Amino acid sequence: MEKVTIRDFLKKKEKKEKIIMLTAYDYPSAKIISQTNLDGILVGDSLGMVVLGKENTLKVTMRDMLIHLDAVVKAKPPQLIVADMPFLSYETSIKDAVKNAGLLARHGADAVKLEGGEEMRDVVRAIVRAGIPVMGHIGLTPQRFLRIGGYRILGKREKEEEQLLKDAKTLEEAGAFSIVIENTYSDVAKKITESISIPTICIGAGPYCDGQILVIHDLLGLSDFTPYFAKKYIDLRGLIRRAIEDYISEVKEGKFPGKEHYKSRDS
């Protein structure tokens, strides 16, 4: 598989081929993904909750992102690697935004993702001008859950729908190469997808986007809580628990280690 670029994402929209992404936060996951036909990897700030046990994404730092991005990059996946810009790494000033986006790019990100719509126009434009591709993120934006009164579906009110459409068009005009649409109504996501020329990637926004993304822990059944919009393709949590219980039993019963697992001088 050849290295995936942002041009491949744009071509897929033109050809009406689905773009498929997953999150990854470590070397083993990225190595496995590298052996699949997945299009893109998001090193997401969701790592704060699913890997580091934090309450929300607000507590994820640039240091956290760089450590996990480094681990993914070392697996050398051919997929497009997109890195999330964590909370307060791009909101305080355009200068900080470009500097932090550049830091992620230097550590191997092919693109960066940031949350927000119309209000992020100048930030997106500046990062793109610096030569770094930007993926937008609208709808439910977890870094702003306090402002919207918690984690809720957006787009029910006409005003919210109009703002989402405006946000998408503004991000496209600012130079974003694609947009994640999270937790909105499927008909709203469809309208957005049909109104812009760059790809839309859905998570909890229905089947009409140009692509889909899931948190890998949800897909594998490793999460404490699986949101309604995610599908658990395997119960890896249960398999791991059973493997650990088998290990405990075999050690107690003297079955492990077996002769094949150690060296004896008299053998």
From Swiss-Prot:
In terms of InterPro entries, this protein maps to:
Pantoate_hydroxy_MeTrfase, Pyrv/PenolPyrv_kinase-like_dom, Pyrv_kinase-like_dom_sf
Signal peptide bounds: none
Q: Which cofactor does the UniProt annotation name?
A: Mg(2+)
> What's in the keyword line of the UniProt record?
Coenzyme A biosynthesis, Cytoplasm, Magnesium, Metal-binding, Transferase
Pathway given for this chain reads: Cofactor biosynthesis; coenzyme A biosynthesis
Q: Provide any one GO MF term from the record.
A: 3-methyl-2-oxobutanoate hydroxymethyltransferase activity
Main location group: cytoplasm
**Gene Ontology CC terms:** cytoplasm
The EC number of this protein is 2.1.2.11
| Subcellular compartments | Cytoplasm
Which note does the record give on the cofactor?
Binds 1 Mg(2+) ion per subunit.
Name the reaction it catalyses.
3-methyl-2-oxobutanoate + (6R)-5,10-methylene-5,6,7,8-tetrahydrofolate + H2O = 2-dehydropantoate + (6S)-5,6,7,8-tetrahydrofolate
Q: Which CDD domains match?
A: KPHMT-like
**Residues that bind 3-methyl-2-oxobutanoate:** D45, S46, D84, K113
| Sequence positions that bind Mg(2+) | D45, D84, E115
Q: What positions does UniProt annotate as the active site of this protein?
A: E182 (proton acceptor)
Q: Does the keyword Magnesium apply?
A: yes
Subunit details for this protein? Homodecamer; pentamer of dimers.
Protein family per UniProt: Belongs to the PanB family.
Protein name, entry field: 3-methyl-2-oxobutanoate hydroxymethyltransferase
Q: What organism is recorded for this protein?
A: Sulfurisphaera tokodaii (strain DSM 16993 / JCM 10545 / NBRC 100140 / 7)
Q: Top-down, what is the taxonomic lineage of the species of origin?
A: Archaea, Thermoproteota, Thermoprotei, Sulfolobales, Sulfolobaceae
Name the gene. Answer: panB
